[in-house]
Amino acid sequence: MDDAVSVLVVDDNQGFLRAARAVLEEAFAVHTVENGTDALAFLERRPPFPDAPRPAFVVLDFHLPDMSAPAILGRLAESATLRAIPVLVLSQADWDEDESAARAAGARAFRVKPSRVQALREAVIDFWKEHGDAGADPARRG
């Protein structure tokens, strides 16, 4: 899958990460981390991820144990390279405050975390089609 579109999925729920990998790996090169600290290290290519690929987009849980999505988005906004990466924020809660905070911090989209894995796959592919390379096949880089 060397030519697959790379996505970073950030969530503290290992079950969610396993499910996300299972349903997304047919269309994307999936990378996962469990917290905001590791997400930033991956994106900034710092240890323990100095050779991490630059993801085409990020799927980010709003509520992580070490920092919130807006805090992570704020750090991304400080980097000319990283601020261009589209971020889809997911949350268990359908709270307007969470969506407003995520969008104000730079999230391109906010969705309630789907309960069905197929719905997750559809949401991620739709996000990529809308915010990634225009008209790109999600299984190939444009």
Regions found by a protein language model. Give the residues of each.
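Short, glycine/charged-rich "phosphate-handling" switch motifs in NTP-dependent
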Residues: 108
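The feature encodes the CheY-like receiver
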Residues: 65, 95
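Active-site residues of response regulator receiver
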Residues: 60-61
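Short amphipathic alpha-helix used as the core "switch/output" element in two-component signaling
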Residues: 70-83
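Acidic, metal-coordinating helix/loop segments flanking the phosphotransfer/catalytic sites
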Residues: 32-57
